[in-house]
Amino acid sequence: MNRKTPVKRTRVKQRRLSADDRRNEFVTRATELFAEEGFGGGTRALARKLGVTQPLLYRYFPSKDDLIKEVYRKVYLGPLETGWDKLLSDRSRPLRARLQEFYQAYTDAIFTRKWLRIYLYSGLKGLDINRWYVGMVKDKILTRIIRECRHEAGLAVSKPSAAELELAWVFHGGIFYYGVRKYIYDAPVLEDKAQMISDALDIFLAGFERIAENAADRRRAPVKVAG
């Protein structure tokens, strides 16, 4: 009876990750986890779900907040570092064309299930991510758009009024909610995103024109002299 020759099992040597690669791997896996399950639980539970030990996780991120901040930097700030401020401020091009191109690129960056779920989860959890991001949108995007609208309307450069900011937020928020309806609620939407942006711009620019006209009327109004 012939004896079978034992099969030699070759151990696959795993590539040892560098510190930077390991850190990036943690951030990527944490991003996926936060998008699916939110931000609940402590570092021990987080390490278990990431498939690593808690001490190893601590070597790269001393606290859960540190990991969340890195996820925020990668997911939220990374896509925004694309020179959009220069695009919005380029007065050699028509304002409407700049806004159309900006919101096309902006929504291309944020309209993903992962991005939107993390944003909504962080809002429910009361994390700083939302406050940071809302502040960034106000200071870097909406204030700049209002400044360009004021220039287009021939108004003096000044701090945005409450009415101007609110109009800009309604416009911006409407475009944002299009993404929520499509990628979070799986609700039917107009599939032509460029057309949606163009329609929203019609409403916003008409509204800003009315605000500009009201401001001009107030400047022209005669001053009543008492007595």
Regions found by a protein language model. Give the residues of each.
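N-terminal intrinsically disordered/low-complexity leader segments
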Residues: 1-21, 87, 212-227
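Amphipathic alpha-helical linker/stalk segments
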Residues: 71-101
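Hydrophobic/aromatic residues within well-ordered alpha-helical segments
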Residues: 22, 64, 71, 75-76, ...
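Hydrophobic alpha-helical segments that form the core
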Residues: 158-184, 192-206, 227
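Short alpha-helical scaffolding segments that buttress acidic/His motifs in well-ordered protein cores
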Residues: 103-106, 119-123, 171, 175, ...
